[in-house]
């Protein structure tokens, strides 16, 4: 098969592993810088051009769209959909998952376990926002943050007020969530491909830190999932419409709760923690499912 990886950096671990794994299975794999693609929108024969030439017809596209380029990246993915190319994650599903509020609203509607969450931009009564999620300790997040950036743990109501006021000064949309203390600074990353959890790791925050992101110095190890945790991860992926994603779960006293669904999960941490060929399993999914015009949305919106 001829497959393209949409990635701005061919030297990232995930991009290199996907190229290596695909070529090892006999596929022709190109890495294409998403931002350097340009499109012929009005033509009856939709095209994508790159470095002065029309891109060939690919059998499948693996989008690795960074959060900072979601708007243009999903436009490129949508153009591939209009051309009838199979995409591992469709543009509408990527957009859905990148909007943290929209994600939580959709998950909530389907009865997926979530931490108690509030959303605000410029509330008239900050104390009521805090009371509404059960009071401190609580976690306050900037809606646009990634890799644990823009996430603050407020241990008292007064501290929470101060943080919310500071974020309001930035004219930012903020999310206020109950702090799942019983998780003890750990979460579970479930790697879902094709409605199956193919790998899972437990990430533990470093001493004195509550964010378990590996980018923030957390550690990771193999974990055995309960049936409920596995079902939660699979259902969350289905709600988002993602064929490939990382579902981050906390173990609360009320059962597993979903913190985030990541449409472009990194491969390095999960492969090292589990010793599994995650990249190879992504290609197994592509080989079984990549057919022309088989996307559910077909680029319609």
UniProtKB/Swiss-Prot annotation:
Residues that bind Mg(2+) 1: 248, 260
Cofactor(s) named in the record: Mg(2+); Mn(2+)
Record-listed E.C. numbers: 6.3.2.-
Cofactor note: Binds 2 magnesium or manganese ions per subunit.
Binding site for ATP: 141, 178-179, 187, 211-213
Binding positions (Mn(2+) 2): 260, 262
GO biological process: protein modification process; SOS response; translation
Annotated residues for binding of Mn(2+) 1: 248, 260
GO cellular component: cytoplasm
PROSITE patterns per UniProt: ATP_GRASP
Amino-acid positions noted as binding Mg(2+) 2 in the UniProt annotation, renumbered to this chain: 260, 262
Example GO molecular function: metal ion binding
Enzyme class, first EC level, given as a word: ligase
UniProt keyword list: ATP-binding, Ligase, Magnesium, Manganese, Metal-binding, Nucleotide-binding, Protein biosynthesis
Signal sequence segment: none
Domain ATP-grasp: 104-287
A Pfam family this chain is assigned to: RimK
NCBIfam families assigned to the protein according to its UniProt record, in alphabetical order: PRK10446.1, rimK_fam
Family: Belongs to the RimK family.
UniProt xrefs under PANTHER family: RIBOSOMAL PROTEIN BS6--L-GLUTAMATE LIGASE, RIBOSOMAL PROTEIN S6 MODIFICATION PROTEIN
Stated name of the protein: Probable alpha-L-glutamate ligase
Organism encoding this protein: Vibrio vulnificus (strain YJ016)
């Amino acid at each position: 098969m001829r497959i393209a990886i949409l990635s701005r950096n061919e030297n990232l671990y995930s991009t290199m592993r996907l190229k290596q794994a695909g070529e090892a299975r006999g596929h022709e794999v190109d890495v294409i810088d998403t931002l350097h693609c340009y499109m012929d929108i009005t033509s009856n024969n939709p095209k994508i051009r790159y470095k002065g030439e029309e891109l060939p017809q690919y059998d499948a596209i693996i989008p690795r769209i960074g959060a900072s380029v979601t708007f243009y990246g999903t436009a490129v993915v949508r153009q591939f959909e209009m051309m009838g190319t199979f995409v591992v994650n469709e543009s509408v599903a990527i957009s859905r998952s990148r909007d943290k509020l929209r994600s939580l609203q959709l998950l909530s509607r389907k009865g997926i376990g979530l931490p108690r969450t509030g959303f605000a931009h410029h509330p008239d009564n900050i104390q009521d926002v805090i009371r509404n999620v059960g009071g401190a300790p609580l976690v306050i997040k900037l809606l646009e943050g990634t890799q644990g950036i823009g996430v603050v743990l407020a241990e008292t109501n007064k501290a929470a007020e101060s943080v919310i006021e500071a974020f309001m000064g930035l004219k930012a949309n903020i999310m206020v969530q109950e702090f799942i203390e019983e998780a003890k600074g750990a979460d579970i990353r479930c790697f879902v491909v094709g409605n199956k959890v193919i790998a899972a790791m437990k990430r533990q925050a470093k001493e004195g830190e509550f964010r378990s992101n590996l980018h923030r110095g957390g550690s990771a190890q193999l974990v055995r999932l309960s049936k409920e945790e596995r079902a939660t991860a699979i259902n969350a992926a289905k709600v988002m419409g993602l064929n490939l994603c990382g579902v981050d779960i906390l173990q609360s006293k009320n059962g597993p709760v979903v913190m985030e669904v990541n449409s472009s999960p990194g491969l390095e941490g999960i492969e090292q923690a589990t010793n599994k060929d995650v990249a190879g399993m992504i290609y197994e999914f592509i080989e079984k499912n990549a057919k022309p015009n088989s996307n559910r949305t077909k680029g319609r919106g």
